[in-house]
Amino acid sequence: MSSFSRNLLRTAGKAKSLPAYSRNAVPSSSRFVQLTAEASRPQQELPASKSEKFKVDLNRDAFKGYNFDVPKLEWETSKDELVDLYSEMVKMRRMEMAADQLYKQKLIRGFCHLAIGQEAVAVGMEAGMKPSDKLITAYRCHPFTVQKGGTIKSVIAELFGREAGISKGKGGSMHMFTPTFFGGNGIVGAQVPVGAGIAFAQQYMNTNDATFAMYGDGASNQGQVFEAYNMAKLWTLPCVFVCENNKYGMGTSAERSSMNTQYYTRGDVIPGLQVNAMDVLAVAAATKHASNFTLGGNGPLLMELVTYRYGGHSLSDPGTTYRTRDEIQTMRSSSDPIQGLKARMLHWGVVEEAELKRIDKAAKEEVDQAVEEAKQSPQPKEETLWTDIYYPGTEPDWMRGRDRTEIHRYR
């Protein structure tokens, strides 16, 4: 044994023991703040027409601001929109549940991160964004892909690695894209400066569109996130930085990894907005307000969406070694975004229970059909390995393959 190793062991023997962390080390009260699914009530008697707009009051705890005027505690909606929001959240959950089962059947391989419990984030953001606004996120991206123009079939087929996949079977779970959705990115936090770059391009081309650059609480301490904040503020970019705070970065609670878990306050001179993201109407209202703010020439905004994932970090994580089953069940029973919207619609008389059951059944049938169609799609042909790497017309003359003797010539 070297002298260095002996000294290290002697030092370790004299050191004070570190505090032990248990699953209950973080008070549940600090975890669950702002996570109630209660939201709102109509400001007026509901119109008879399903398409006619009316306003609902949002819960007084829907928003918190940091050097920022929070949105009004109201959302203008219609019976049709409420039903659509419910239907979309149910379909997103059904899609993710199907992916869970297909993974366990070994029909999906590799990385797979699901968003069960977080449906109000993707659905609510899409309801509040302009169609031309851009969005980029990390690897928990399946619902965003569908909401930004993909299909359930294209997502499932991509998970299978088939030609009908949104990335033609070459991207997998973490790499899905549409014309307004820039992924689906596998490197923790790396998408945030890319999002700032997208916002710069929009500003440069004067498109009057906003970019929503998303990341999780687990990525919030990455240096590149703060570098992106700095450049976006310096250049007054139309960028909304969105921390999707589901309370755990892999198996580490937010309180154990961040000295300040009020993520919406971490932008220094960038204003912040915290949102109850278990309420789809609050998410929609906040997203619309954020887009209008940054497109008004005010520069970036830091928005924190407080949510909760029911499953593990990925399908290789059972999700119960670092939190109790009671904690998960409490969230399911008290703050579920789908059940919360369902209860309000029934209470307001927007829809009958039978209609919601029909929607639930239709969502299951749509996902089941998408799965079967995805299974029929063929595997990508080997020669497609060389395609979709460069923008058409910008390819080099040739590219080296798996070894120096394998050469593919584009021209």
Predicted regions and their residues:
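Conserved acidic/glycine
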Residues: 2-121, 311, 318-321, 325-411
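Short, mixed-charge, low-aromatic patches
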Residues: 40-47, 54-57, 75-84, 112-116, ...
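Alpha-helix boundary/capping residues
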Residues: 89, 106, 128, 159, ...
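Residues that form or immediately flank small-molecule/cofactor binding pockets and catalytic motifs
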Residues: 94, 140, 277
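Cofactor-binding active-site loop characterized by glycine-rich and histidine/acidic residues
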Residues: 97-101, 105-235, 253-260, 264, ...
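A general secondary-structure junction signal
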Residues: 139, 305-307, 389
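Glycine-rich ThDP/TPP pyrophosphate-binding loop and its adjacent helix/strand module
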Residues: 181-379
